[in-house]
Amino acid sequence: MDFSRLHTYTPPQCVPENTGYTYALSSSYSSDALDFETEHKLEPVFDSPRMSRRSLRLVTTASYSSGDSQAIDSHISTSRATPAKGRETRTVKQRRSASKPAFSINHLSGKGLSSSTSHDSSCSLRSATVLRHPVLDESLIREQTKVDHFWGLDDDGDLKGGNKAATQGNGELAAEVASSNGYTCRDCRMLSARTDALTAHSAIHGTTSRVYSRDRTLKPRGVSFYLDRTLWLAKSTSSSFASFIVQLFQVVLMKLNFETYKLKGYESRAYESQSYETKSHESEAHLGHCGRMTAGELSRVDGESLCDDCKGKKHLEIHTATHSQLPQPHRVAGAMGRLCIYTGDLLVQALRRTRAAGWSVAEAVWSVLWLAVSAPGKAASGTFWWLGSGWYQFVTLISWLNVFLLTRCLRNICKVFVLLLPLLLLLGAGVSLWGQGNFFSLLPVLNWTAMQPTQRVDDSKGMHRPGPLPPSPPPKVDHKASQWPQESDMGQKVASLSAQCHNHDERLAELTVLLQKLQIRVDQVDDGREGLSLWVKNVVGQHLQEMGTIEPPDAKTDFMTFHHDHEVRLSNLEDVLRKLTEKSEAIQKELEETKLKAGSRDEEQPLLDRVQHLELELNLLKSQLSDWQHLKTSCEQAGARIQETVQLMFSEDQQGGSLEWLLEKLSSRFVSKDELQVLLHDLELKLLQNITHHITVTGQAPTSEAIVSAVNQAGISGITEAQAHIIVNNALKLYSQDKTGMVDFALESGGGSILSTRCSETYETKTALLSLFGVPLWYFSQSPRVVIQPDIYPGNCWAFKGSQGYLVVRLSMKIYPTTFTMEHIPKTLSPTGNISSAPKDFAVYGLETEYQEEGQPLGRFTYDQEGDSLQMFHTLERPDQAFQIVELRVLSNWGHPEYTCLYRFRVHGEPIQ
């Protein structure tokens, strides 16, 4: 802002009612100055500027002395003699540098103002007059801002110079206050010298000014701002909690030091009482000298007097030096603080890395979206593949969490987390304190570093100890008579204080002697039971003697009789107590013996029962063996009789009746089992051929007559029509009854189910069952439910990876398992001609609950690939416990390296009543 050319104007003294009104003290919005100049026919002071509210400045004036005012008048007269052109080219900064510096009210400290006001009457100081226009006040309210942005002016001033100007004002006021008191210390003289230099320096640079500018709109706050704000709140909260914990540790350590000092205090009391007596005489001798000291000399330190401000600074330095020597507990607390700081820094780094990871994830998502836009087919295939594998992994993870984490480890994890929660809070305590030297001074909320050190126990709290004072210089002669009453009062106070100290020393010595006597008596009492009894007897004896001197002789005899009776009663009670003790010991011994016997009997009882059971079984076996011997002899006799009878029957045809001849004769009339099986197989083939031929010719089902004729044509006679119907019906019934004729309690349609959370991983093929534009949409795979469904055909099975797997089945009801059926397709139906994926060795376990890790074994079996496709396996014995959950554990297969197939698994048994 370009201000109009301005110079100071002083109206002539001859003008009537000259008020010294100048344009500098008027507003740019009034015409009073123009009217004043027109009325008195004065030369215009300066051109009227075009001012706005942005260019308004705060104008203040400082107090001037008479010499300064004369200098200003001379300067004014000089400036009036200069031509108008020179006045126009002169800048505002040059004119202000030539005048007396004026500093802003905002730079003037409250302390300097109060001091100058309080000493105005004594020192005849001219107070500063602040001239501010109401329009300027409104501008200050509306235009002031805290953003570091300057606009609308071309003379900003020097901020550093402004600070120096403020120092100058404070220094002048401090010097004036010190001179008004009539006393100046060394530090204040140094301050005065410094302010003189600053005054000269500030006169060169000129006055300062405050800039008022319009408020600007703040920039929009992003996500990083709020994240930093959240981190700051977390830091401050953790720091506050850590400060509380550390301060609590400090209080505990101070309490421990208090107890230690208390123990040491009792040992040093005797020595201190003697030293206090010696020091008391020295204090009396020193009292005379202190009584003659002046009030100014009592506040001297190292031979120099100090004012109140210097005393406060000196006390602060001593206090800081005292706190710098921290004891061992403070060092321990500091070490803990540094540990918390290091941990907090690691936590901050972890949060920053997490934020960086989030940013990288966002970039990855953006790249995936761009890929979807550029190559939709490839992106769709990758997305479906990723979703499928991700869904399977998610289900597996949930199953693992449900089985292992939530059911087994959740309670332990909760307990450990509760224990680690305070440690985690402590670890986050030093987030904002890394790299600082003093831990306690940086605590934001509970900053208790200014606490006074705890007073030791051996220090006397209720009295002033006389101590050696530093040697004071000879007193200076003061000619002011007003200080003599103060010196006399101070001497009286010191004398009374010394007397009180002496009295306290005497009382402390007496208390120390009494404490020593009491300690001796306590040591005597602590020597043992004999010392205690002796002390009690002495006290009782003294009391009895006193009572004997006071009471009459009758009372003494009564007391003696009462004492004798009391002793007799005590002796009786001791006898009874001794007897009770003996009886209780005997009872205790008997009780221990009975417990030992009972324990041994409890251990021997199962063994005895087992031995008795074995003896009974042995007797039973002996009786059965004797019966078998009798049966053996009877069988031998029967065999001999039969042999004789056969020989007699065939003795007519055979000479000698040998057994070999009999066997040859029977084999000629009968056939063996193998020959019968071959004949039956041929008969079945012939029957099937005849029935097939009949159906192809007639197109109808065969009748009973056709079946009989087919049997006759096959060359086998002796089978009637009814027998043929029975054979066919039995075969059809067995096939319709699930090929076993027994109830399958694992069948899904009958109420069975699969616990998929404990089954093995399904083996998935890479062949897509459904695809769209070459993108696979659905892969074929069977679930474990196929194992308990009745449909069996090649490929309709559950395959799991490897040769070992698990299958857990929940039965329709609780049963006593007795039989298990394993079914696989035959080799004739296999495309490869073998069934290497069939299970070989497997075991079955009974489980009480689905969370049980190891169940009760029900049997271990082997499936034969060369046998029938449906094979049944029986348990060795009926289990004692009923189960509703059965686990099939496949241990090996017949050689397939990648997977194992299960087609059908049945469970048979007896339901519980």
Swiss-Prot record:
The chain crosses the membrane at residues 416-436. Residues 223-302 are annotated as: EMD-binding. Residues 69-81 have a biased composition (Polar residues). Residues 108-120 have a biased composition (Low complexity). It is found in: Nucleus inner membrane. Residues 69-120, 456-485 are annotated as: Disordered. Residues 491-533, 563-638 form a coiled coil. Residues 703-913 are annotated as: Sufficient for interaction with SYNE1 and SYNE2. Widely expressed. Expressed in cochlear outer hair cells (at protein level). Seven isoforms are expressed in testis including testis-specific isoform 5. Isoform 5 is the only isoform expressed at the end of sperm differentiation. Six isoforms are expressed in muscle, heart and brain, four isoforms in kidney and three isoforms in liver. Core component of the LINC complex which is composed of inner nuclear membrane SUN domain-containing proteins coupled to outer nuclear membrane KASH domain-containing nesprins. SUN and KASH domain-containing proteins seem to bind each other promiscuously; however, differentially expression of LINC complex constituents is giving rise to specific assemblies. At least SUN1/2-containing core LINC complexes are proposed to be hexameric composed of three protomers of each KASH and SUN domain-containing protein. PANTHER family: SAD1/UNC-84-LIKE PROTEIN-RELATED (PTHR12911), SUN DOMAIN-CONTAINING PROTEIN 1 (PTHR12911:SF23). This is SUN domain-containing protein 1.
